[in-house]
Amino acid sequence: MNNFLSASQVVSLIAAVGDKRTVIVEGENGIGKTALFHMLRKLPKFADHIAVQPIDCTQLSDGSVWMPDLDRENGVSRELPNERFGVSASNQLGVNNSKPILVGLDEIAKAPQFIKNVLAPIIYERRVGNLGMPEGSVVVCFTNLSIEGLGDSIQAHLRNRLVFVK
């Protein structure tokens, strides 16, 4: 029995459920997982989305996702999202004319645990810092098969909130 989906089946699945659940695409090293993101971008369904460039999670560090912004007058701080995620004061949940965002997180399981923790609100809640992604936004992740021994791992308690496909 074949437990693997074709590229077009994976793209169809993401298009169908990606705005409600994050899909993680697992596949062999070099098989073209990131190319699926570019296939998604071309679908008419995503024509009005802001499709950001795929983000290599292994290259993220402190401040790559959001930075603190101090409001000394009110004695508070806020989290300002990095522009690479497509979220801003003028493009966020609840703001008229905001466009949904298509985000691809590449090599998610290879990222250091603290980066996975920082990315968790994006993956599970469609939120960067304090700003929610506009309705219809899609987050899709890509990683290698854990059996390849390339250091890819996602903790079990986090796996049950995601849709995994191969």
PLM features: residue spans?
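AAA+ P-loop NTPase catalytic core and its hallmark functional loops
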Residues: 1-166
